[in-house]
Amino acid sequence: WEAAKRNPDGTIAVNEKFTDMKALGDWLHERGLKFGIYSSPGNLTCGRYLGSLDHELQDAETYNSWGIDYLKYDWCGYGKKHPSEPDRNLVSSYIRPYLFMQRHLRQQPRDIFYSLCQYGMMNVWEWGAFIDANSWRTTGDITDTWKSLYSIGFEKQVDLYPYSKPGHWNDPD
Protein backbone atom coordinates (compact mmCIF):
# COMPACT_ATOMS: atom_id res chain seq x y z
CA TRP A 1 0.00 0.00 0.00
CA GLU A 2 2.92 2.31 0.65
CA ALA A 3 4.89 4.27 -1.93
CA ALA A 4 8.68 4.22 -1.96
CA LYS A 5 8.92 7.84 -0.75
CA ARG A 6 6.87 10.14 1.44
CA ASN A 7 4.92 13.10 0.10
CA PRO A 8 6.84 16.42 -0.01
CA ASP A 9 5.16 17.46 3.27
CA GLY A 10 6.45 14.29 4.98
CA THR A 11 3.14 12.43 5.14
CA ILE A 12 2.85 8.82 4.06
CA ALA A 13 2.40 8.39 0.32
CA VAL A 14 0.35 5.50 -1.03
CA ASN A 15 1.13 3.48 -4.15
CA GLU A 16 -0.98 3.09 -7.30
CA LYS A 17 -2.72 -0.04 -5.94
CA PHE A 18 -4.10 1.73 -2.86
CA THR A 19 -4.85 5.25 -4.01
CA ASP A 20 -7.44 6.14 -1.35
CA MET A 21 -6.87 4.65 2.10
CA LYS A 22 -9.73 6.65 3.62
CA ALA A 23 -12.15 5.14 1.10
CA LEU A 24 -10.76 1.68 1.86
CA GLY A 25 -11.25 2.28 5.58
CA ASP A 26 -14.81 3.49 5.01
CA TRP A 27 -15.55 0.44 2.83
CA LEU A 28 -14.24 -1.92 5.52
CA HIS A 29 -16.15 -0.17 8.31
CA GLU A 30 -19.40 -0.22 6.30
CA ARG A 31 -19.07 -4.02 6.30
CA GLY A 32 -18.44 -4.23 10.03
CA LEU A 33 -14.72 -4.90 9.64
CA LYS A 34 -11.74 -3.26 11.30
CA PHE A 35 -8.86 -1.62 9.45
CA GLY A 36 -5.32 -2.50 10.53
CA ILE A 37 -1.95 -1.26 9.35
CA TYR A 38 1.70 -2.05 9.97
CA SER A 39 4.69 0.22 10.57
CA SER A 40 7.97 0.45 12.45
CA PRO A 41 9.65 3.01 14.70
CA GLY A 42 12.66 2.72 12.38
CA ASN A 43 13.45 4.12 8.95
CA LEU A 44 12.14 0.94 7.33
CA THR A 45 9.84 -1.95 8.17
CA CYS A 46 10.78 -5.63 7.93
CA GLY A 47 9.48 -5.55 4.34
CA ARG A 48 11.76 -2.59 3.53
CA TYR A 49 8.89 -0.10 3.33
CA LEU A 50 9.05 3.30 5.02
CA GLY A 51 8.87 3.31 8.80
CA SER A 52 7.73 6.14 11.05
CA LEU A 53 11.09 7.39 12.37
CA ASP A 54 10.91 11.19 12.73
CA HIS A 55 7.35 11.16 11.30
CA GLU A 56 5.46 9.72 14.26
CA LEU A 57 3.01 12.61 14.67
CA GLN A 58 2.32 12.84 10.94
CA ASP A 59 1.74 9.10 10.75
CA ALA A 60 -0.57 9.06 13.78
CA GLU A 61 -2.61 11.90 12.26
CA THR A 62 -2.72 10.09 8.91
CA TYR A 63 -3.84 6.81 10.51
CA ASN A 64 -6.60 8.73 12.28
CA SER A 65 -7.74 10.40 9.04
CA TRP A 66 -7.85 7.04 7.24
CA GLY A 67 -9.93 5.43 9.98
CA ILE A 68 -7.26 2.97 11.12
CA ASP A 69 -8.39 0.76 14.01
CA TYR A 70 -5.22 -1.26 14.64
CA LEU A 71 -1.51 -0.44 14.40
CA LYS A 72 1.12 -3.16 14.61
CA TYR A 73 4.33 -1.29 15.39
CA ASP A 74 7.25 -3.61 14.69
CA TRP A 75 10.76 -3.23 16.13
CA CYS A 76 12.09 -4.75 12.91
CA GLY A 77 13.81 -1.93 11.06
CA TYR A 78 14.51 0.07 14.22
CA GLY A 79 17.41 -1.88 15.69
CA LYS A 80 20.30 0.51 16.11
CA LYS A 81 18.98 3.25 13.85
CA HIS A 82 18.27 6.12 16.23
CA PRO A 83 21.39 8.20 17.02
CA SER A 84 19.96 9.59 20.28
CA GLU A 85 19.99 6.20 22.01
CA PRO A 86 23.12 6.01 24.19
CA ASP A 87 22.87 2.39 25.33
CA ARG A 88 20.93 -0.42 23.71
CA ASN A 89 21.05 -2.45 26.92
CA LEU A 90 18.79 -0.10 28.88
CA VAL A 91 15.09 -0.90 29.10
CA SER A 92 14.40 2.78 28.39
CA SER A 93 15.94 2.42 24.92
CA TYR A 94 13.31 -0.24 24.14
CA ILE A 95 10.44 1.75 25.65
CA ARG A 96 11.23 5.11 24.05
CA PRO A 97 10.19 4.50 20.43
CA TYR A 98 6.93 2.84 21.48
CA LEU A 99 6.04 5.47 24.05
CA PHE A 100 6.75 8.21 21.53
CA MET A 101 4.26 6.82 19.00
CA GLN A 102 1.73 6.04 21.73
CA ARG A 103 1.67 9.67 22.85
CA HIS A 104 0.84 10.75 19.31
CA LEU A 105 -1.81 8.05 18.87
CA ARG A 106 -3.54 9.09 22.10
CA GLN A 107 -3.75 12.69 20.83
CA GLN A 108 -5.99 11.51 18.00
CA PRO A 109 -9.78 11.47 18.37
CA ARG A 110 -9.90 7.90 17.05
CA ASP A 111 -9.19 4.96 19.38
CA ILE A 112 -6.43 2.97 17.68
CA PHE A 113 -5.49 -0.44 19.09
CA TYR A 114 -1.73 -0.31 19.61
CA SER A 115 0.18 -3.56 19.18
CA LEU A 116 3.88 -3.60 20.06
CA CYS A 117 6.05 -6.07 18.23
CA GLN A 118 9.54 -6.39 19.60
CA TYR A 119 9.71 -10.11 20.18
CA GLY A 120 9.65 -10.07 23.98
CA MET A 121 12.90 -8.14 24.34
CA MET A 122 13.51 -6.48 27.70
CA ASN A 123 10.46 -8.24 29.19
CA VAL A 124 7.93 -6.08 27.38
CA TRP A 125 5.09 -7.69 29.36
CA GLU A 126 6.42 -5.82 32.42
CA TRP A 127 6.11 -2.37 30.81
CA GLY A 128 3.68 -2.73 27.89
CA ALA A 129 0.64 -1.73 29.93
CA PHE A 130 2.59 1.11 31.56
CA ILE A 131 2.94 2.83 28.19
CA ASP A 132 -0.73 2.07 27.46
CA ALA A 133 -0.12 -0.44 24.68
CA ASN A 134 -3.00 -2.80 24.00
CA SER A 135 -0.85 -5.84 23.23
CA TRP A 136 2.80 -6.83 23.03
CA ARG A 137 4.69 -9.69 21.46
CA THR A 138 6.11 -11.97 24.12
CA THR A 139 8.32 -14.14 21.88
CA GLY A 140 10.07 -14.36 18.57
CA ASP A 141 8.29 -15.53 15.43
CA ILE A 142 6.38 -18.78 15.46
CA THR A 143 7.14 -21.40 12.81
CA ASP A 144 4.87 -24.02 11.27
CA THR A 145 5.84 -26.84 13.62
CA TRP A 146 4.07 -28.30 16.64
CA LYS A 147 7.24 -27.77 18.71
CA SER A 148 7.25 -24.05 17.91
CA LEU A 149 3.52 -23.67 18.54
CA TYR A 150 3.73 -25.54 21.83
CA SER A 151 6.78 -23.65 23.03
CA ILE A 152 5.49 -20.18 22.11
CA GLY A 153 1.80 -20.78 22.73
CA PHE A 154 2.00 -22.67 25.99
CA GLU A 155 5.40 -23.02 27.68
CA LYS A 156 6.49 -19.41 27.32
CA GLN A 157 3.10 -17.92 28.21
CA VAL A 158 2.30 -19.79 31.41
CA ASP A 159 3.97 -17.27 33.75
CA LEU A 160 2.89 -14.16 31.85
CA TYR A 161 -0.84 -14.20 32.61
CA PRO A 162 -0.53 -11.68 35.49
CA TYR A 163 0.51 -9.01 32.98
CA SER A 164 -2.68 -9.29 30.94
CA LYS A 165 -5.79 -7.38 31.93
CA PRO A 166 -8.69 -5.71 30.14
CA GLY A 167 -7.26 -3.52 27.39
CA HIS A 168 -3.73 -4.96 27.70
CA TRP A 169 -2.78 -8.43 26.43
CA ASN A 170 0.20 -10.69 25.87
CA ASP A 171 0.62 -11.61 22.20
CA PRO A 172 2.42 -14.95 21.76
CA ASP A 173 2.45 -14.48 17.94
Task: Outline where the language-model segments fall.
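Aromatic-lined carbohydrate-binding/catalytic grooves of carbohydrate-active enzymes
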Residues: W1-D87
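Short secondary-structure boundary/capping segments
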Residues: D9-T11, L53, Y98, G128-W136
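Generic recognition of stable, solvent-exposed alpha-helical segments in well-folded globular domains
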Residues: T19, A23, Q58, S93-R96, ...
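Extracellular/periplasmic catalytic domains that process cell-envelope and extracellular macromolecules
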Residues: L28-E30, N64-S65, R106-P109, G128-F130, ...
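Generic structural hydrophobic/aromatic packing signal, biased to beta-strands
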Residues: F35, Y63, M101, Y114-L116, ...
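Residue-level detector of functional hotspots within protein domains
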Residues: D54-L57, E61, V91, F100, ...
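Glycan-recognition surfaces
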Residues: Q58, F113-D173
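Extracytoplasmic, non-cytosolic globular domains
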Residues: G67-Y70, W75-Y78, P83, D87-G120
